[in-house]
Amino acid sequence: MESPPTVPLYKPRLGGENLGRINAINSALSALFAAIYAIGVIMLAPISFMPFQVRIADCLMPMAILFGWPAIIGLTLGCLVANFFGGLGYIDVIGGSVANMAAGFIAWKIGLRRFHGSWFVATIVENLTVTAIVGFYLWFILAIPDVIINGIVVPGLAASWAGIFMGSLVAINALGYALLRILSRSSVIGPLRSHGLRVYTKEE
């Protein structure tokens, strides 16, 4: 009696239609992040620019940990548009966009490591990346002078970094981390995944 023919293992591939749908979803998500970020910065312009700022829209930065490239691209484009209206020139437009892309990418990669506390560490590094880049070029283009506090000379660059760091501590590490925890709940990511959206969670 002949044995039944061996059926080769088959790994399904995404067809052109499904791949196109996923690309459309990712593009829409990037556009959504870009729009919300830009609108948030422009509407809250008085507290979103200069060395001492609390850019509330930066609460979206940790979303790069959860959504990867669609969020990174959206936050980069959103910053580019927002900073164009900020009045600080092309250095702010380019520098802020680079800061968002670098911070988002690094945070996403740290989040993918999935060690205990990886998301918290990722948001701290995100803050430090934004602080280092934005604080430096704002010090440069605004020529921030040294300041004297209680007889101690504080370099202008240090003051600029401190201003950005404290604002990002509120926007990224407090508001953003809380938003990240809320959106990572199964009740939220379940419907997103059912529509073909890739979500990176600690459980994967």
Regions found by a protein language model. Name each.
Residues 42-52, 80-204:
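Membrane-embedded alpha-helical hairpins and interfacial helices in multi-pass inner-membrane proteins
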